[in-house]
Curated annotation (Swiss-Prot):
GO biological process, alphabetically ordered: catabolic process
Name used for this protein in its record: Acetaldehyde dehydrogenase
EC number: 1.2.1.10
Family of this protein: Belongs to the acetaldehyde dehydrogenase family.
SUPFAM superfamilies: Glyceraldehyde-3-phosphate dehydrogenase-like, C-terminal domain, NAD(P)-binding Rossmann-fold domains
Pfam families, per the entry: AcetDehyd-dimer (PF09290), Semialdhyde_dh (PF01118)
Catalytic activity annotation: acetaldehyde + NAD(+) + CoA = acetyl-CoA + NADH + H(+)
Entries under InterPro entries matching the protein: Acetaldehyde_dehydrogenase (IPR003361), Acetylaldehyde_DH_C (IPR015426), NAD(P)-bd_dom_sf (IPR036291), Semialdehyde_DH_NAD-bd (IPR000534)
Residues that bind NAD(+): S159, A160, G161, P162, G163, T164, R165, Q166, N167, N272
Length: 297
């Protein structure tokens, strides 16, 4: 009988890495979390991992490479760090699920294009704003050609840790590229806003699209397409909600999405981070299931 699970590791035990740890431990069917690695021995993330009985190391990427038993790594560090980690993981034959905006590997979105990249050795989760909004752009553009799409992701300032703040330029560029490459808009733009309101607000996303054709039948098809993709995202992100359904003003379509977090480790207002970790787990589970099935044949 072949392996039942792949051995997983997390590098980067910050907000995202720690939330992901709890999701793997509580929900994963195909992953066994073997290691959480960081670079600060006394960090909160490593302490919490030890409390859960998971091995930890402050030796960073080297700790993963030294073990020889890791099949898949979630990189929740920074875009700059992942650019250094990616070739090392590739040479070691370890699958990388990249939660930074580094975009070394292809962009993946569970409800849009994961099957195309199921055998890839490095996949990129785009950004939290991308995971929230690109499915909507895709839902519109599969009905009618979309000349331009712009997204505004507004997140609670408290949910933006140092990694998110360091990556803001990469966030806007990577999300805009994803709007074109995955959302199929001809041009894309992304804006991120950090809202300091207290109590913190839920993640809100506004999607604007300029479409090539307009008539009542197309409007109806777009509305149905958006509703359909929202149900697909909700299968792995229960807090993903349609706040304002498609509104049409000439050839401009506006949609608003709210994301409430699952509350595994992060507060519920951190829907932006929860969306990224939910998507990462959904991607890794499908990749692991595929790899395990291939190994059993």
């Amino acid at each position: 009988m072949g392996k039942q699970r792949l051995n997983a590791a997390i590098i980067g035990p910050g907000n995202i890495g720690t939330d992901l740890m709890y999701k793997i431990l509580r929900r994963s069917e195909y992953l066994e979390l073997k290691l959480v690695a960081g670079i600060v021995a006394e960090s909160e993330g490593l302490r919490l991992a030890r409390e859960e009985g998971v091995a930890t190391s402050a030796a960073g990427i080297q700790a993963i490479l030294d073990r020889k038993d890791i099949d898949i790594v979630f990189d929740a560090t920074t875009a700059h760090a992942h650019a250094q980690h990616a070739p090392l993981l590739k040479d070691a034959g370890i699958i990388a699920v990249d939660l930074t905006p580094a975009a070394v590997g292809p962009y993946v979105m569970p409800v849009v294009n994961l099957e195309e990249h199921i055998d890839a050795m490095n996949v990129n989760l785009i950004t939290c704003g991308g995971q929230a909004t690109i499915p909507i752009v895709y839902a519109i553009s599969r009905v009618v050609p979309t000349a331009y799409a712009e997204i505004v992701a507004t997140i609670a300032s408290k949910s933006a840790g140092p990694g998110t703040r360091q990556n803001i330029d990469e966030f806007t560029l990577t999300t805009a590229k994803g709007i074109v490459d995955i959302g199929n808009a001809q041009k894309g733009k992304a804006i991120i806003l950090l809202n300091p309101a207290d109590p913190p607000m839920m993640m809100n996303n506004t999607i604007y699209a300029l479409i090539d054709q307009v008539d009542p039948a197309i409007e109806q098809k777009i509305t149905e397409s958006v509703e359909e993709i929202i149900k697909e995202v909700q299968a792995f992100v229960p807090g993903y909600k349609l706040k304002i359904p498609p509104m049409f003003d000439g050839n401009k379509v506006t949609v608003m999405i709210e994301v409430e977090g699952s509350g595994d480790y992060l507060p519920q207002y951190s829907g932006n981070l929860d969306l990224e970790t939910c998507a990462a787990l959904a991607v890794a589970e499908k990749m692991a299931k595929h790899k395990l099935a291939a190994g059993a044949n």
